[in-house]
């Protein structure tokens, strides 16, 4: 379960503090999915970074399962990210010195859940079979996005945070990725929180909320 309570975040600017998130409350049960929508600059990506423990809120609390993020130190947060969550952000952060096949397995191996059969299934579903021996610099943006998604899914995370995971994909590949995400939700207790601008993508998930001016509506 993911539970966010009264979360607030501001950033300093020359004109003074800029409120980005104002009193966000959000709850997701294990195995559920939520599409987070809203205009650019509304705080969607900031919310995902806070939930991932990559930034600190000014106030409020975030609880994932038994973990309260505001009570964890950097080492504990890093271990939690490795073992329990999958991240697909707009910066794909693939490891340049590793081939695609090793990038795919990297997160799962760190989490101690590397499953060659599941990885093979992901490779087939994401259309990566011909790319396994390539390095990230040899891939297009859309190909890198598919690898990043495969890496996040390979460990069957308890919580998957995805920021525009289909943004660089054509419609056919986007539909295949969504089918794969829904399949993962059916087969595992993974909880999905996805940022998307696409009404078509959001409509495939169980629930939708809109973030506007730092508040959920």
Which residue stretches match the model-derived regions?
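ABC family nucleotide-binding domain
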Residues: 2, 7-211
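Conserved switch/coupling elements of ABC/ABC-like ATPase nucleotide-binding domains
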Residues: 213-217
């Amino acid at each position: 379960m993911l539970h966010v309570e009264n979360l607030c975040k501001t950033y300093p600017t020359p004109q003074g503090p800029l409120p980005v998130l104002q009193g966000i409350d959000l709850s997701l049960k294990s195995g559920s999915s939520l599409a987070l929508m809203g205009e650019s600059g509304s705080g969607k990506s900031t919310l995902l970074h806070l939930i991932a423990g990559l930034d600190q809120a000014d106030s409020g609390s975030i609880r994932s399962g038994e973990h309260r993020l505001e009570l964890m130190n950097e080492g504990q947060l890093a271990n939690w990210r490795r073992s329990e969550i999958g991240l697909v952000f707009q910066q794909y952060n693939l490891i340049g010195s590793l081939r695609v096949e090793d990038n795919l397995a990297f997160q799962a191996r760190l989490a101690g859940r590397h499953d060659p059969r599941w990885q093979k299934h992901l490779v087939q579903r994401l259309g990566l079979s011909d790319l396994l021996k390539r390095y990230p610099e040899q891939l297009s943006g859309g190909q890198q996005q598919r690898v990043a998604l495969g890496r996040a899914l390979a460990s069957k995370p308890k919580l998957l945070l995805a920021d525009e995971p289909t943004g660089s994909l054509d419609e056919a590949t986007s539909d295949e990725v969504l089918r794969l995400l829904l399949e993962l939700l059916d087969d595992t207790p993974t909880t999905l929180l996805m940022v998307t601008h696409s009404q078509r993508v959001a409509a495939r998930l169980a629930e939708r909320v809109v973030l506007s001016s730092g508040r959920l509506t």
